[in-house]
């Protein structure tokens, strides 16, 4: 059994060394760490290379630098495809791993052979006055009680319920789902969704990551209150819906495929409402309320459309 960690970096020098310490000092050692830097303008690459040299990790840890900026999602996909481990852990450049993160997660995946993606809870760590705080409803879903939950595909489970830095994926599954990839699809959303299509998405309710939240995070809370950002989000979700639908059809899961088609149609109605002020779509959207992540979004988006000039 081989364990890989992959990290996509960009201007992450401020916190990188702390994160590398928590990976190096795991109770179950990792066999490989690949860092892929996306043309950072700071000393991220230098910090990583000096760290590897300082601890004599050249045989198992390495740094790759992109010739041109690829963007977060594509860079993460690139580095993950390079990993050779049976289990692949995603690492952000600015978090802290608890010492037994790898040991606990590998033990669960070894015990549950159907688990293709394992997620965990996390503890938020706020950095700076501009850091967005995790909503109470999110924190309430992370009881840190060490219970294992299997995520079953449903209209509500489509919406991502874990962070990429809290995920581990089987390498064979990652390569198996490569045909469903599209440019720009973030690895956390892709793993969460497609693992459910394979009936292998699990969530371990144990805080194994101290997730640093600051103004430069790729994922922040409450940031989709403009038409442009919401349309971009919904369009990406439509692309993900189509990928799920194709995977489900390839596996002969027709009932679930129909569900994803309905989810996709709902997103189209929501886009037309806020982008085109298509208020006639409010009526059919009532039939899709069960597919919303939050029902109050229905009223919020009507308000956005009303205010749009």
Language-model features, listed with the residues they occupy:
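Short, well-formed alpha-helical segments that are part of the catalytic scaffolds
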Residues: 12-25
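Glycine-rich, basic loop-to-helix element that forms the pyrophosphate-binding segment
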Residues: 65-83
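Conserved nucleotide-sugar donor-binding catalytic segment
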Residues: 81, 143-224
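Flexible acidic/His/Gly-enriched loops in nucleotide-sugar-dependent glycosyltransferase catalytic domains
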Residues: 57, 74, 104-108, 112-173
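Short loop->beta transition adjacent to catalytic acidic/histidine clusters or analogous donor-positioning motifs
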Residues: 2-4, 24-35, 43, 59-62
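C-terminal subregions of glycosyltransferases and related glycan-biosynthesis enzymes
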Residues: 153-157, 185-186, 197, 201, ...
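A conserved acidic beta->alpha catalytic loop
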Residues: 37-47, 68
């Amino acid at each position: 059994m081989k364990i890989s960690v992959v990290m996509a970096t960009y201007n992450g020098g401020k916190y990188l060394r702390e994160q590398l310490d928590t990976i190096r000092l795991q109770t179950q050692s990792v066999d490989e760490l690949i860092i892929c830097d996306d043309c950072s303008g700071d000393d991220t690459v230098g910090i990583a290379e000096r760290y590897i040299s300082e601890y004599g990790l050249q045989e198992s840890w390495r740094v790759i630098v992109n010739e041109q900026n690829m963007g977060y999602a594509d860079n993460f996909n690139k580095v993950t495809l390079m990993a050779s481990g049976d289990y692949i852990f995603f690492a952000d450049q600015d978090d802290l791993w608890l010492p037994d993160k790898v040991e606990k997660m590998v033990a669960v995946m070894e015990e549950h052979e159907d688990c293709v993606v394992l997620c965990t809870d996390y503890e938020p760590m706020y950095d700076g006055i501009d850091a967005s705080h995790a909503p109470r409803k999110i924190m309430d879903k992370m009881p840190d009680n060490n219970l294992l939950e299997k995520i079953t595909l449903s209209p509500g489970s489509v919406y991502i319920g874990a962070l990429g830095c809290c995920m581990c994926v089987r390498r064979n599954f990652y390569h198996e789902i490569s045909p469903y990839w599209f440019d720009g699809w973030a690895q956390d959303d892709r793993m969460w969704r497609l693992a459910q299509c394979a009936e292998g998405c699990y969530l371990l309710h144990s805080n194994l990551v101290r997730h640093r939240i600051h103004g430069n995070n790729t994922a922040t809370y409450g940031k989709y209150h403009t038409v442009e950002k919401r349309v971009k989000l919904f369009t990406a979700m439509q692309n993900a819906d189509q990928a799920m639908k194709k995977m489900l059809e390839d596996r002969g899961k027709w009932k679930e495929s129909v569900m994803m088609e309905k989810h996709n149609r709902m997103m189209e109605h929501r886009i037309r409402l806020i982008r085109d002020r298509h208020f006639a779509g409010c009526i059919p959207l009532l039939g899709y309320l069960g597919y919303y992540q939050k029902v109050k979004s229905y009223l919020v988006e009507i308000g956005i459309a009303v205010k749009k000039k």
